[in-house]
UniProtKB/Swiss-Prot annotation:
Positions of the UniProt region annotated as Disordered: 420-447
Assembly information from the UniProt record: Dimer of alpha and beta chains. A typical microtubule is a hollow water-filled tube with an outer diameter of 25 nm and an inner diameter of 15 nM. Alpha-beta heterodimers associate head-to-tail to form protofilaments running lengthwise along the microtubule wall with the beta-tubulin subunit facing the microtubule plus end conferring a structural polarity. Microtubules usually have 13 protofilaments but different protofilament numbers can be found in some organisms and specialized cells.
Biased composition (Acidic residues): 430-447
Name of the gene: TUBB1
InterPro entries found in the cross-reference section: Beta-tubulin_BS, Beta_tubulin, Tub_FtsZ_C, Tubulin, Tubulin/FtsZ-like_C, Tubulin/FtsZ_2-layer-sand-dom, Tubulin/FtsZ_GTPase_sf, Tubulin_C
Record's function text: Tubulin is the major constituent of microtubules, a cylinder consisting of laterally associated linear protofilaments composed of alpha- and beta-tubulin heterodimers. Microtubules grow by the addition of GTP-tubulin dimers to the microtubule end, where a stabilizing cap forms. Below the cap, tubulin dimers are in GDP-bound state, owing to GTPase activity of alpha-tubulin.
Protein's UniProt name: Tubulin beta-1 chain
Family: Belongs to the tubulin family.
Natural source organism: Arabidopsis thaliana (Mouse-ear cress)
One Pfam family in the UniProt entry: Tubulin_C
Cofactor: Mg(2+)
Length: 447
């Protein structure tokens, strides 16, 4: 019931994805061979079919599709700790690589492989009793995750128009750049995500580094540490689908509560408690502490500061044994104390949900998803970098050589700029704006 089909694409997506499966397997007591050996069968198995398909002999197989345009990352997943748990047919890869080129992923190399991926997606979807939606892990800076990822999203959109499409998208970082053409790839991807995705959880390596460095006190964070943070959040977002809870939410409820205008579906995510590995057993958590940490700007996993904008909506998902009353009080408290950071024309704009089962090794945890206008900082930054290069037509021949047209770049650029100004418009909007317009008009007539 209510299955979610997981797709991971490109190097980044596959690394995040495989970490996510480790976390989910751990929570459901599934060992690396796919057998159940947990300690509380009724809870762990009750809704295990959200993410797993039960195969013959009681093995649980992830509903995951893994795609890439080169075999490297897939090979390392296959030889990794949980490599044997995936269905072998669900690895779909090419040999050529996309070479950080969005056009290769979207139009040439990726387009050749996409039908093979869609076949696997169809096969998995047919195995579902009542498919709720898709979750896609990818980065927007490279070629495969961004180009082929968005191609797959638009194809799935065509075929399953009424299913939720949730993405975990790693944006290029402000200071740490992996490739020069990141702004191009990211802008072209956002152009697609605005139209074809329902909910985008925005992640960013630099913000994740900061969390690892500042809060978790890791001196040299590895991508493994970063991906661990992401997977904790991913697990939190879907926990109320997978475990019984007092206040449940699913992907659609999340969307209905978080998206006031269809294009503004890019969310900041946060997670609490963030503790360094050694000090986990020393913290006693209370709901107020969780709430405080969860709303902390330093906890946001993308490089935008929520204090520079206002929240249109937000959602807080708590896990563990706690009273719903206390959760409600804390959420209300946050809204009352920081009312200037919430738009006043959406009253009670924070949704909370409570799930009884905490993550492994912690008593309580919470996941935060917020729709804040300050995320425009991120789009604005990428857009400026895009414009700087596009004005000089730098690196453009790599894209036009794959058959792209400059027009598409111009469209993507203006779509991104529209998005920024939409966020700005709602940030400045007030509840009694209509009256102001009337007054202005009257003055015009008088003069």
């Amino acid at each position: 019931m209510r299955e979610i089909l997981h797709v991971q694409g490109g190097q980044c997506g596959n690394q995040i994805g495989s970490k996510f499966w480790e976390v989910i397997c751990d929570e459901h007591g599934v060992d690396p061979t796919g057998r159940y050996n947990g300690d509380s069968a009724d809870l762990q198995l009750e809704r295990i079919n959200v993410y797993y398909n039960e195969a013959s002999g009681g093995r649980y197989v992830p509903r995951a599709v893994l795609m890439d345009l080169e075999p490297g990352t897939m090979d390392s997943i296959r030889s990794g700790p949980y490599g044997q748990i995936f269905r072998p047919d669900n690895f779909v890869f090419g040999q050529s690589g996309a070479g950080n080129n969005w056009a290769k992923g979207h139009y040439t190399e990726g387009a050749e492989l996409i039908d093979a991926v869609l076949d696997v997606v169809r096969k998995e979807a047919e195995n579902c009793d009542c498919l709720q939606g898709f979750q896609v892990c990818h980065s927007l800076g490279g070629g495969t995750g961004s180009g082929m990822g968005t191609l797959l999203i638009s194809k799935i959109r065509e075929e399953y128009p009424d299913r939720m499409m949730l993405t975990f998208s790693v944006f290029p970082s402000p200071k740490v750049s992996d490739t020069v053409v990141e702004p191009y790839n990211a802008t072209l991807s956002v152009h697609q995500l605005v139209e074809n995705a329902d909910e985008c959880m925005v992640l960013d390596n630099e913000a994740l580094y900061d969390i690892c460095f500042r809060t978790l006190k890791l001196s040299t964070p590895s991508f493994g540490d970063l991906n661990h943070l992401i997977s904790a959040t991913m697990s939190g977002v879907t926990c109320s689908l997978r475990f019984p809870g007092q206040l449940n939410s699913d992907l659609r409820k999340l969307a209905v509560n978080l998206i006031p205008f269809p294009r503004l579906h890019f969310f900041m995510v946060g997670f609490a408690p963030l503790t360094s590995r050694g000090s986990q057993q020393y913290i006693s958590l209370t709901v107020p502490e969780l709430t405080q940490q969860m709303w902390d700007a330093k906890n946001m996993m993308c490089a935008a500061d929520p204090r520079h904008g206002r929240y249109l909506t937000a959602s807080a998902m708590f896990r563990g044994k706690m009273s719903t009353k206390e959760v409600d009080e804390q959420i209300l408290n946050v809204q009352n104390k920081n009312s200037s950071y919430f738009v006043e024309w959406i009253p009670n704009n924070v949704k909370s949900s409570v799930c009884d089962i905490p993550p492994t090794g912690i008593k309580m945890a919470s996941t935060f998803v917020g729709n804040s206008t300050s995320i425009q900082e991120m789009f604005r930054r990428v857009s400026e970098q895009f414009t700087a290069m596009f004005r000089r037509k730098a690196f453009l021949h790599w894209y036009t050589g794959e058959g792209m047209d400059e027009m598409e770049f111009t469209e993507a650029e203006s779509n991104m700029n529209d998005l920024v100004s939409e966020y700005q418009q709602y940030q400045d909007a007030t509840a009694d704006e209509e009256d102001e317009y009337d007054e202005e008009e009257e003055q015009v007539y008088e003069s």
